[in-house]
């Protein structure tokens, strides 16, 4: 793969044009464009292992051909830390039967702050020989090691990495757990957080956040408002978010483990939820809602829920479903800010953001 700057610029412009065309029916302003480094931008990577020539190699598969492996010696789109670790880990498993026996998959997770974790997946139980070798590996490479085997997990070091991102002149620390979703492009994620921080602005009242994950947006946005009510359904992400709130001394956020659909029912007083025990929703004075939904976008009921807010800050990983949701809201809200974030260079995927304000 060649990392030609002119080709990247052309692909970036194609994405901007696509977003502009999708939002044209809604009189959207010209999008701000946030580009990506051309290489070493991806903070996580996953490889299968493939035996050839008497040894195991890192391998990936094309979406068009799941049978023929593409052997990988280096992975230029991945972070420099991952590229440093790849040959070191390969040398370690080649030298150790305890590490290599029935090893079939390797996952790397790194951060801009320099932290790293490696997950090793096996088709066998992990014994004391593995633990001895894995402990030495963790020390030699200065990483945490996770061993996975048939639903069991062994942790050497931590089961998370720590990221540090600067937003609005403040550095936030994020605990990112193994197996949980994190934004893969740290540089663009930081740009995205700063755009959302600026777009929301200082508010005298409260913010509702749906799909908060590990608190990626929650931490900086909480500094812009009086109080935040944030929702997330994943237990792993909820625990990480609570830890991140505590680590950063952010004390104005209440986090509840509800889906967006369940919260809609709670706000509409359709039925009570035990997970909301002790939380009086009527004490919140919401004027703004922040949403970062999955690729399917917001379901119609959640979309209708957001309509009751004066300001809708929306981050999307799928511009088609973003446009569909805006079409549902266009009669009451207009786009006042728009942005495109190139989270996924060299692919057709993009991240985008809009601020919708009541007409």
UniProtKB/Swiss-Prot annotation:
Annotated catalysed reactions: uridine(54) in tRNA + S-adenosyl-L-methionine = 5-methyluridine(54) in tRNA + S-adenosyl-L-homocysteine + H(+); uridine(341) in tmRNA + S-adenosyl-L-methionine = 5-methyluridine(341) in tmRNA + S-adenosyl-L-homocysteine + H(+)
GO CC field: cytosol
Amino-acid positions noted as binding S-adenosyl-L-methionine in the UniProt annotation, renumbered to this chain: 183, 211, 216, 232, 292
Entry's family note: Belongs to the class I-like SAM-binding methyltransferase superfamily. RNA M5U methyltransferase family. TrmA subfamily.
PROSITE patterns assigned to the protein according to its UniProt record, in alphabetical order: SAM_MT_RNA_M5U, TRMA_1, TRMA_2
Function: Dual-specificity methyltransferase that catalyzes the formation of 5-methyluridine at position 54 (m5U54) in all tRNAs, and that of position 341 (m5U341) in tmRNA (transfer-mRNA).
EC numbers on record: 2.1.1.-, 2.1.1.35
Name assigned to this protein: tRNA/tmRNA (uracil-C(5))-methyltransferase
Active site (record annotation): 317, 351
GO molecular function: rRNA binding; tRNA (uracil(54)-C5)-methyltransferase activity, S-adenosyl methionine-dependent; tRNA binding
GO biological process entries: tRNA methylation
Organism: Pseudomonas fluorescens (strain SBW25)
Keyword field: Methyltransferase, S-adenosyl-L-methionine, Transferase, tRNA processing
